[in-house]
């Protein structure tokens, strides 16, 4: 595979364990990566759990960190500037923003200012703790009406997520694409043979078992 000849889309997703990143990696694994591939924009300059996987698929990790700035206000300003320089210096043409509340539009504004031609806003959130912050509430309400002027494609994981993040006219006119979360369902289909073998291997054949699928972190 020669990923250097592929068209690359810059994706905003942390490279630690998480639902959004897992979805993007599942999609990436099923792409013809000779033609289309993802690069990943991250906001912290550190090694993350899944970055070796995406680097192995021909992706680049692009860092726009402001962690070196101690003052909270200056850190925010610095992050905006470094995001702008990241888009500009890397000649980014297509951005896939994995977001939730419309306050994430800050990144869209910076991308467009830096010359990004196409921005997809992909919402995965039908409600967020961000609404505990009054400033974020004000920003989200102010930004929503501006979204159609700056966002080229609207994607949502559900109708509720679309209602949460997008302007009413985008939702009412269904000017968004419904993208189900990327899960390979066949991997999780019930199999009686596997069930019996695993229970036998664990010595719990005739016992009541409570399982946890997830991470304790």
Where are these regions (language model features)?
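Conserved donor-binding/catalytic core segment of Leloir-type glycosyltransferases
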Residues: 7-10, 204-217
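N-terminal strand-loop element at the rim of the active site
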Residues: 10-18, 28-75
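Histidine-centered beta-alpha loop that forms part of the nucleotide-sugar donor binding/catalytic region
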Residues: 13-14, 66, 98-100, 123-126, ...
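A short, charged, and often flexible helix/loop element on the N-terminal side
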Residues: 58-82, 94-97, 128-135
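Nucleotide-sugar donor phosphate/pyrophosphate-binding loop at the beta->alpha transition
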Residues: 74-81, 118-121, 127-150, 163-170, ...
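An aromatic- and histidine-rich active-site surface loop
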Residues: 94-116, 123, 127
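A short, active-site helix/loop in glycosyltransferases that binds the activated sugar's phosphate group
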Residues: 149-189
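A short helix/loop element that forms part of the nucleotide-sugar donor recognition site in Leloir-type
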Residues: 189-204
């Amino acid at each position: 595979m020669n990923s250097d000849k592929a068209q690359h889309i810059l994706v905003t997703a942390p490279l630690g364990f998480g639902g959004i990143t897992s979805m993007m990696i599942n999609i990436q694994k099923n792409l013809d990566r000779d033609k289309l591939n993802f690069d990943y924009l991250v906001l912290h300059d550190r090694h993350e759990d899944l970055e070796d996987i995406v680097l192995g698929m021909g992706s680049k990790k692009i860092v726009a960190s402001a962690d070196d700035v101690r003052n909270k206000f200056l850190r925010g300003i610095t992050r905006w500037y470094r995001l702008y320089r990241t888009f500009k210096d890397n000649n980014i043409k297509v951005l896939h923003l994995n977001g939730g509340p419309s306050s994430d539009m800050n990144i869209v504004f910076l991308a467009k200012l830096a010359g990004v031609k196409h921005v997809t806003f992909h919402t995965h959130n039908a409600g967020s703790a961000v609404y505990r912050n009054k400033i974020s509430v004000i920003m989200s309400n102010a930004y929503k009406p501006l979204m159609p002027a700056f966002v080229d494609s609207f994607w949502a994981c559900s109708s509720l997520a679309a209602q949460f993040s997008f302007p009413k006219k985008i939702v009412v006119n269904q000017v968004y694409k419904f993208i189900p979360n990327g899960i390979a369902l066949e991997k999780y289909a019930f199999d009686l043979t596997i069930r019996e073998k695993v229970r036998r291997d664990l010595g719990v054949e005739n016992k009541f078992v409570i399982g946890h699928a997830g991470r304790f972190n």
